[in-house]
Structures are given as C-alpha cells and as structure tokens.
C-alpha cells in the first residue's frame, strides 16, 4: 500500500538521521551498521546496534523511535498498538504538537510526525493525518528526496481518500518535477550520510527501478483523481500511460474498468474485470486489500447501472461473503483483547469493507422493491456513517415503502387497478356489497415501545428525516466542506488503499465546495439542494401518515419554496399541501393547490450540467450512480399528473357540497386517460356522486363493472328532483391514496 511503503522508507531514513556533526565516529559507525541491517531485513542485528547506541547516548529520543520501528518490522508489522504508544510518548517527551511547527527547527522531528501520520492513515483518521502531512510538506525543502517523495505520496493518497482530487493532482505535478530533477534535486545534508551506507549493490539500477515504480504510481493516482473529477478526456490519456507502465496488472485493469463504467461501456467494464488475474495479487495480508471482494463489488455496481438489480444483489452478497471470510482470518490472529490493532499486519486495518458493502446492498435492495431487507442492511451501515444525510433519507424510504404495501405495479411505475368490492354478504333481499377500503391510513405502529427503536415504522421514518434535515448545512449557498469523506470499495478506488472508509466524525478542512457523505461520494451544492427537496417531500408524506397535518403543511410549503425544485416534487408538494389543508378544514386553500395548471412538468429535474459534472453520480455509491436511470413512478406524464389533480379536486368540491363541479372534474379527468387507467378511488367518487344524486342503479352498475359508465354524464340534467333523501347526508369518500405517490 502507498502508506505502508512510506512507513518502511521513513524508518530507514531515520536510522541515518542521527548522523550529525556532533556525534563520534563510533556512533556514526553504529548508526550506519544499524541502517544497513534494517535495510537488509536483519532486524535482530539492527536492534543490537541500536542498543549499543542507546548505551552511548541515552538522551536521544530518535534512537528510541528507531528501536520501536525496528521492533515493529521484526514482528512483521503486527504490533501497531506498541508503536502507536511509543510515538505518543515521544511526542509528549519532545513537547511538540503539530500545530506548533513553525520553523525549520522542527525538521528534526519530521520522522516522528511522519510515522504518526502513517499510523493515523491506517486507523482511518484521515483528517488528522492530513493535518500532520501538510505541516510536513511546508518544510519539505531540507528533506532528502526519497523521504520527500514518501511525504508527498502519503498526502496524495489522503487527498484522494477525502475527495480532494484537485489538491492531489497539484501534488502529483510537484512529484513529477521532483522525480525528473533526479537524485540531486532535493538532497540535503542528511542524504550524504545515507548514501554512504548504500554503496553496496548497483545503485544506478536500483535508482532507475525506483523511478519507474514512482512514475507508474503517479499515473495511477492521476487516473483516480480524474475519475473523481469526472474528467474523462484527461483520464483517457492517463489510462494509456498506466497500461504502458503497469501492463495488465490487476490495479491497471480495475482502473480501466472504472473508466469504461463511467463512460457507460458496461459490458467492456465487465470484460476488463474478468480479464484481471486476481491470483497474481500478493494477498490482503501483504497489501491490506481483498481483491476478490473488490471484484464482486465492482460487478455489483456495474450490473446496477445496467438495471440488472437482482444480479447486482447477488454480486454484493458474494463480496460480503469474501469480506467476512477475510475478517474471520484476521480476527483469528488477535490474542490480546486490550490491543485491538495488534496481532495482524498494520495494512490489514484497512481491509474490512463490511459497512460499505452493506450500504451498497441496502440501496440495491431498496431499488428492487425489498424495503425490509434493505432496512436491515442500512440500519447497520448507519451506525458507522451516521453523519450521512443521504443514508438517513434512504432509511426513511425503506420505512415508507415497507408500510405502504407497494404493489408490483406501483414498483414498476404503473397505476394499480384494485377492485372496489371486497366481498358480498347475505342473500336475496339482505344481500349486501362490502366495499374495499381504498384508504391507506396508517395504523398505530407504536405498540408500547419507543419510536426511536430502529424498526421499519413510519414513526422511525420521521426520526430519520429529522436527522437528515439537521445534517444539511444551514446555508446551502455556501455549504461547509467537511473533508474526510471516504469512498466505499467501489469502482473509484479499485486496487489502491483508497478502498478504506473514513469515519463519520470529520471536521471542516479546506474549500467550501462539498460536505462528506461517506461511504458515497460527497454532496456538492446542487446535490444538496436536490437532497433537501427529497427530504422535505418525504417528511410531508410521513407527517400526513402520522396525522400531523400542521407539520405536513409546513414541510410541503417549504418544499414549494425551494428555488430549484423538480417538476415531480413540485407536483407532490401541491398534493401533500392540499391533503393537509383539507384535514385542517381549509378547503378553499386546498383547491388552490389542486389546480391542474400547477402541473407543468413531472420530470426528475436533473439537469444535463449536473450529469456531466457527476454531482449525483458517486463512483462509489452504486445505487446513486445516475439520476437519469432512476425508475419513474406513476404518474409518468403531465397528463397523468393532471388527472390525479382533477380527481382530488373533485373530492375537495364534494366536501363543499359542490357536486356539479366535482362531476365536471371527474368527467374531465376520465376523458384524459384510458378507461382501464381510472383508479378505484375515482370510481368510488363517481359512485358517491350518483348516490348523492339519487341514482342508485347506476351506482350499482359502476360497482359491478368496476369502471366509470358513459351514462353518468346525463344524470345531472335528468335528476332534478330528489326521489330519495337520506336522513343523514352521505359523507364524501376520502381519497388519501392519490396523495401517497412517492418518487425515489
């Protein structure tokens, strides 16, 4: 891994760092011998030389640091806790904090800071690691070239992990200059001491190999940076360089597959993944990367993009199985429960991708229409990624879908054709028709337990949506960036160490361009606006389901006030506001919202600019990958949406006893759609109007045929006098089903 090798380089450099003008010849000789033994892998001899140095100079903390590093490598890098403890003690001993680094005098402590940054990197504390790395970069001039490169590579890796691709590419340009200048460009006084101990075997060939390896690594980082920026033209150029320098290795093929995925060449992306030779990979114990896990995960992402959701779930489950197998092997090595980071190589601290995979699997299950299974996956993922507002919205959508009882037709974006007759009871004169309830009023879900308990209920959906709103920045015109977001093990960070995930508690770092939403890609300004609109729409729906009409009206009004509102959500906003107003007995205001002219567009409203920039196309969030492929729910056209408005408007007129206006709305809506598309609620509305008009036989015919009858048009003129007047006026049938249409 990128930071694993720098750790080795850092230890090697510090062995020679003790050679200064104030030391004796004996100390120089012991230091050189210790460095040579460390470089050759003879850690026992190295520790013996360091022990002799410690006897001579007991006050030099660098010897203690080198001893800790040598012990760490002697134990195959499995004693991370001990090394971390030693570094913290040394930091307190020199009374130096990163924030206090303000001059070249602190260069002497550079190796201590660097090793701390490497450990923070492996502990997934990326924000803190960047803080240390950037301080080191400020004093990079006096560093010798190899150490300077190690610092730069570590920072590049961290910038890629935290979605700061621009910074990473700038630093890569600096690295290219550094390498092109050769070994004489950055050398300080420390380098001469180190070079004297390396004159063993063919330094020119070794140097050339290191330069080629560094160039290959730079090309791979550039590809990853351009992929994050969705700069496909620049990425295409760098892909050629990667294939020339790295050949058909697994990292290069995974990167090229990611590139083809972003271009929409899904079959080619699958072909490239299948052509990678996973067996040649060194294995997760050496690199910290489970290539098989990444392979299945990437296949799941690609098949989602191809709308093959069940195959995508299959591949994500395979990835989860591989990840669980790897974690089981790693946990078997740990013996001391008090040292949770020890007992396995430090690089394997980044291996576990369970929560990223659960996130992907949950989103995939939600799209395929299995909300309860999706909820189980996402509720586990949210324990780690609790600062992701988009994840809280997805959890709320799981709760809504689970309690809505969405049919297969609704899942496919079609109106349902439910029968209006539930059963027939009695015989002869006592024969009665029992009408099916078309109302989807939510029952009481809280059966004595707290609504905060994570179950797929509407009450818990309300909590999830409140969390999502609170996590959004107050001023979306200038959203605060909290760098530290991390991609999941997806196509974006294929075989590099960017497969690890950032913890959710990250602080504002630099540039107010986005806020993190790990494990998916960060939320930029336009995406934040779209996300807020979706959260408000769901909040209004949930408030209606819970009977909180004032809150529903508040959310609907906020939704309609959003400056960039898609046509589909504007349609829902008017419907939800109207339903809340009707429940509050403000029918006149509701009729204003139900004006069919309010509906001019029902698109999802993702602009072409946004798609080009990829702001809603996280390379690491499979299910969010492309808004234009999102399933369109009913109504799918302006005409269908206006019929829904007219049906609901007719119901509102019925509540004011304006039956002629209601009948007119009903007829107008029925003329705009196919007779088979008329919803059962509209048939019940027509039945109610005929009963109110005294035409019982026609009402029975409608119920029997389950459709509107053309003859209904003439009855407003034929029946002028009331033959049958009920003692109690018939109440209009409520139709909340019209306003429960949801858009993912």
Curated annotation (Swiss-Prot):
| Start and end residues of each stretch annotated as Disordered | 1-26, 182-203, 475-521, 602-634
Please list the residue ranges that the record marks as compositionally biased, kind Polar residues: 484-495, 602-612
Q: Which residues form a coiled coil?
A: 73-107
Q: Some GO term, biological process aspect, for this entry: which one?
A: regulatory ncRNA-mediated gene silencing
InterPro entries named in the record: CNOT10, TPR-like_helical_dom_sf, TPR_rpt
SUBUNIT field: Component of the CCR4-NOT complex; distinct complexes seem to exist that differ in the participation of probably mutually exclusive catalytic subunits. CNOT10 and CNOT11 form a subcomplex docked to the CNOT1 scaffold.
Q: Which family does it belong to?
A: Belongs to the CNOT10 family.
- State what protein this is by name: CCR4-NOT transcription complex subunit 10
Q: Which organism is it from?
A: Mus musculus
Upper lineage = Eukaryota, Metazoa, Chordata, Craniata, Vertebrata
